[in-house]
């Protein structure tokens, strides 16, 4: 007789093959039709809010793997907080102004003011940015990120542009805005100032020269030194500086020494000259300039030389010796050539001494026409000419070439220069902004915690923030400045609000096309209209004002900012500075940073290396859920390694999780929780254990989501699927589910456990495997919401009774016993003595405590151990042939069963053949096929 029809074989329409590349877009369309984001918002209305504020990516080009990581991490958090019952809106945004867009538009239509008018150019920039936003939006949605994609914030929206202007007005009103000719990073290709965040450091080869600055009053200088024998020495007397930027020497205004360092006068005996330099660097200098003989004839501290007059090496100019703590012994001579127009430290020390801020270099990088000797030359090619002039004047002591770290433009990858130009700044020490910012940093949670020290160091040492740019596509600095005094218009607050209203209606063109007389009337002739634009870091830096404070769904300050670790010097810092300047507090309660993506060898990704992993390709082949699972599996706090091979391994894990879910669904066929759910107290011991195990996992998973430990969620869920379920529970349960009567308590108990597990696990997976979880959700039995994202964490799990004999400790020991038995079964299998584990019988010889415990299971112990017989006996009955185990008080005997095999359950039982109507079945199967069904209480 064929007994297959009497078995409860699993079946489900849930597909085994994920086919994510095809199914995921269908799911996205379903979410769109459902208007899922709005439904979630409606369902969570009135709940406690959790605000993750989106840092705006730049609207230029397709998204890369770093974008994908960032948006996926944010999605994990927003969805998990939603499942925790929070109202967690997610409003994405884009950064839309700035140079990269200008460069792309220039390629198409030419430069503003040349082939097209500035207004036409800005219009083209706006259209280009809008197209890029649409491109990136589609790709972010394809990743499965849920958000208000229909209503993102764009820094180029008229309202946003107006709010940027209002933010600037408030910062100015609070006294943090300053104007000055200060040295700033200047990109010769951009033709504009750069912010700190726009500068990258790369290695560069530069000339390194030692230059003599002749002393005006040699006798007076020597009088400041302590000389051993009163000897003044002989030959010309010079202070020696060392520089890697010879082109800055035309702007030299002083030579700086460190007041605390020891300086010496060195008498060269080979060419009869005297050189002043730092004692600690003397040997290095003498070695590199090839001095064949020298001796020290005088000592003093740097402080003793303040005010000494020196001759400029090639101009008819006297320059003083000044003092500064920035002078170190890291390299050079201990004497620093000081050009306040070409360096921030030079500028700072120059301000103390009232030095001129001389800048002989134009915005194109060429010396101005009135620059003696070098007029019209480009600074980067003028080094050789400067060196030639120094040689001619006898001022060059030594020249060499070195490789060193040098600032480059982040966009053009070309060297930048420091150049003093009239710029607008947010002053770090005006109104105690730096101190307030450092205090605010201490009130924020930084994840990982090293982020706090990093941003503190940056804020503590940063110069004033140059917020002005000389660009076309950007938000204006809408100020009127008195043409004679340089003072801001006294009614600036009101004027800024008037201008903001105009921008809110007509965009930034409202300022650029404004006739000043329209606002200033008769005063217009006395005031200049500023034509500069704002640094785009200011645009994104005031999203706390333009988005958080304006959007009724959001709130200020945000609960969390989350970006890459480079944003400590970028968005985190610009947001902090503007927020503190405007309101005296940080715009975020917590800041989380993630590392950069690298290939399997830890190398940066680049097209030239051929190691780029494009998220678009991954989604088209493996699916977005595999990419999302990789993000969850990777420790985001450091570098995130990704490659095709790594993603293939992640795909294997995905299949294990999917197959586990499919098996649960298949075994829930015919189960209706409204009719068949078994009460906890009536469930079998093994089923109560697995629900308790799921409860413990759920508690760990929720805590991991709350603390952003996503790799813990990956590990816990994967282990639960592969070990707790796959290698144990489902393996044991299979016999009961297949062979017991369909509506029997043992089978419904197992289905109840699997139902609870599936309900819980689909929610654990939802923030990470969003597409797959939603697919599972549609196949789960029982009434439910339209989407898993409209639900909350499952509350149907329950723990084991602490007073039960089958408590967690019991099951921990049971798992160890099963492992010990399985180990010996494998040996029998390898020997060829058995095929499957059910071909074996096992005797367990136990000490009294273990004997009492295992006796609880009775004959059902065999089901847990997957053997046809499992007999518990006292340890005293173990013979010398019993096998020891690592479990105290347990020895084993295993052997192939000699009893007949039941064709239905495949157990070898003594009672097979004893029933005349079913001679091929064991007694248990006869009960299940023709009787009232077997009874089970344990497993």
Curated annotation (Swiss-Prot):
Write down a Pfam family by its short name.
zf-FPG_IleRS
Residues noted as binding Zn(2+) in the record, renumbered to the chain: 902, 905, 922, 925
> 'HIGH' region: where is this motif?
57-67
Does the keyword Aminoacyl-tRNA synthetase belong to this entry?
yes
State the organism of origin: Methylococcus capsulatus (strain ATCC 33009 / NCIMB 11132 / Bath)
Instruction: Provide the residue positions that the database annotates as binding L-isoleucyl-5'-AMP.
Output: 563
List the record's Gene Ontology CC terms alphabetically: cytosol
Where is this chain's protein located in or outside the cell? Cytoplasm
List keywords of the entry alphabetically. Aminoacyl-tRNA synthetase, ATP-binding, Cytoplasm, Ligase, Metal-binding, Nucleotide-binding, Protein biosynthesis, Zinc
Q: Which HAMAP family match?
A: Ile_tRNA_synth_type1
Under the GO molecular function aspect, what terms does this record hold? aminoacyl-tRNA deacylase activity; ATP binding; isoleucine-tRNA ligase activity; tRNA binding; zinc ion binding
* Source species, domain of life: Bacteria
Protein name listed in UniProt: Isoleucine--tRNA ligase
Residue span of motif 'KMSKS' region? 604-608
């Amino acid at each position: 007789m064929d007994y297959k029809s009497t078995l409860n074989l699993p079946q489900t329409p849930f597909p085994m093959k994920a086919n994510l590349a095809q199914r995921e877009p269908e799911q996205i369309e379903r979410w769109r039709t459902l208007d899922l984001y709005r439904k979630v918002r409606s369902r969570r209305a009135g709940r406690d809010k959790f605000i993750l504020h989106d840092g705006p990516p730049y609207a230029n080009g397709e998204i890369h793997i770093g974008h994908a990581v960032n948006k996926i991490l944010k999605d994990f958090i927003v969805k998990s907080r939603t499942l925790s019952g929070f109202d967690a809106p997610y409003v994405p945004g884009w950064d839309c102004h700035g140079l990269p867009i200008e460069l792309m538009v220039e390629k198409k239509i030419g430069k503003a003011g040349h082939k097209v008018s500035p207004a036409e150019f800005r219009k083209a920039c706006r259209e280009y940015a809008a197209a890029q936003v649409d491109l990136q939006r589609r790709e972010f949605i394809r990743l499965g990120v849920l958000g208000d994609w229909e209503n993102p914030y764009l820094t180029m929206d008229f309202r946003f542009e107006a709010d940027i202007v209002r933010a600037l007005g408030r910062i100015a009103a609070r006294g943090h805005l300053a104007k000055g000719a200060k040295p700033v990073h200047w990109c010769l290709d951009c033709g504009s100032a750069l912010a700190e965040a726009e500068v990258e450091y790369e290695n560069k080869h530069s000339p390194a020269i030692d230059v003599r600055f002749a002393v005006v009053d040699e006798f007076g200088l020597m009088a400041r030194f302590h000389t051993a024998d009163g000897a003044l020495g002989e030959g010309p007397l010079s202070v020696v500086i060392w520089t890697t930027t010879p082109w800055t020497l035309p702007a030299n205004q002083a030579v700086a020494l460190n007041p605390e360092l020891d300086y010496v006068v060195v008498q060269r005996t080979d060419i009869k000259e005297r050189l002043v330099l730092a004692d600690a660097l003397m040997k290095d200098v003498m070695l590199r300039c090839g001095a064949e003989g020298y001796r020290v004839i005088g000592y003093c501290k740097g402080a003793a030389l303040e005010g000494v007059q020196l001759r400029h090496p090639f101009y008819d100019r006297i320059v003083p010796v000044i003092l500064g703590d920035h002078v170190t012994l890291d390299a050079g001579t201990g004497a620093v050539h000081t050009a306040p127009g070409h360096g921030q430290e030079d500028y700072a020390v120059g301000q103390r001494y009232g030095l001129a801020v001389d800048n002989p270099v134009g915005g194109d990088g060429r010396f101005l026409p009135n620059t003696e000797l070098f007029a019209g030359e480009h600074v980067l090619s003028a080094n050789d000419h400067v060196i030639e002039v120094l040689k001619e004047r006898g001022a060059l002591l030594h020249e060499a070439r070195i490789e060193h770290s040098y600032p480059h433009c982040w966009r053009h990858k070309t060297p930048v220069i420091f150049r003093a130009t009239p710029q607008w700044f947010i002053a770090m020490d005006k109104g105690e902004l730096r101190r307030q910012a450092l205090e605010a940093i201490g009130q924020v949670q930084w994840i990982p915690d090293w982020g706090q020290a990093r941003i503190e160091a940056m804020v503590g040492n940063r110069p004033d923030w140059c917020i002005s740019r000389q660009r076309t596509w950007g938000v204006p600095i809408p100020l009127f400045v008195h043409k004679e005094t340089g003072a801001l218009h006294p009614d600036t607050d009101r004027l800024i609000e008037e201008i903001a209203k105009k921008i809110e209606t007509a965009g930034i063109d409202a300022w650029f096309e404004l006739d000043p007389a329209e606002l200033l009337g008769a005063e217009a002739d006395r005031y200049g209209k500023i034509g500069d634009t704002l640094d785009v870091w200011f645009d994104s830096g005031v999203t706390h004002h333009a988005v958080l404070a304006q959007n009724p769904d959001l709130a200020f300050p945000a609960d969390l900012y989350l970006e890459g670790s480079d944003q400590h010097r970028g968005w985190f810092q610009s947001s902090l500075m503007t927020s503190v300047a405007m309101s005296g507090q940080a715009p975020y309660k917590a800041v989380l940073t993630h590392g950069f993506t690298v290939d399997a060898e830890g190398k940066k990704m680049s097209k030239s290396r051929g190691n780029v992993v494009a998220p678009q390709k991954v989604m088209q082949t493996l699916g977005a859920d595999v990419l999302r699972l990789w993000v969850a599996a990777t420790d985001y706090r450091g570098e995130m390694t990704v490659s095709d091979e790594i993603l293939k391994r992640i795909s294997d894990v995905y299949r294990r999780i999917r197959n586990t879910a499919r098996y649960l669904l298949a075994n829930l066929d015919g189960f209706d929780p409204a009719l068949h759910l078994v009460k906890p107290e009536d469930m079998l011991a093994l089923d109560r254990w697995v629900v308790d195990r799921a409860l413990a996992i759920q508690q760990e998973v929720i805590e991991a989501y709350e603390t952003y430990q996503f790799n813990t969620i990956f590990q816990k869920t994967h282990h639960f699927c592969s070990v707790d379920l796959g290698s144990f529970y489902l393996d044991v349960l299979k016999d009961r589910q297949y062979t017991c009567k369909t509506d029997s308590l043992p089978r419904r108990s197992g289905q109840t456990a699997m139902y609870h597990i599936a309900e819980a696990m689909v929610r654990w997976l939802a923030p990470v495997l969003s597409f797959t979880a939603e697919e599972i959700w549609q196949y789960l039995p029982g009434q439910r919401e339209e989407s898993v994202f409209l639900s909350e964490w499952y509350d149907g799990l329950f723990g084991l009774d602490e007073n039960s004999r089958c408590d967690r400790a019991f099951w921990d020991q049971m798992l160890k016993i099963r492992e010990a038995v399985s180990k010996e079964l494998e040996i029998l299998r390898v020997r060829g003595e058995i095929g499957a584990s059910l071909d074996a019988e096992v005797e367990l010889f136990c000490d009294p405590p273990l004997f009492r415990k295992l006796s609880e299971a009775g004959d059902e112990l065999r089901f847990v151990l997957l053997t046809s017989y499992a007999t518990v006996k006292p340890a005293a009955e173990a013979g010398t042939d019993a096998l020891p185990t690592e479990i105290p008080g347990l020895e084993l005997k295993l052997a192939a069963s000699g009893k007949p095999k039941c064709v239905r359950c495949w157990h070898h039982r003594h009672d097979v053949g004893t029933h005349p109507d079913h001679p091929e079945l064991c007694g248990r199967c006869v009960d299940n096929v023709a009787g009232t069904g077997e009874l089970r209480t344990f497993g």
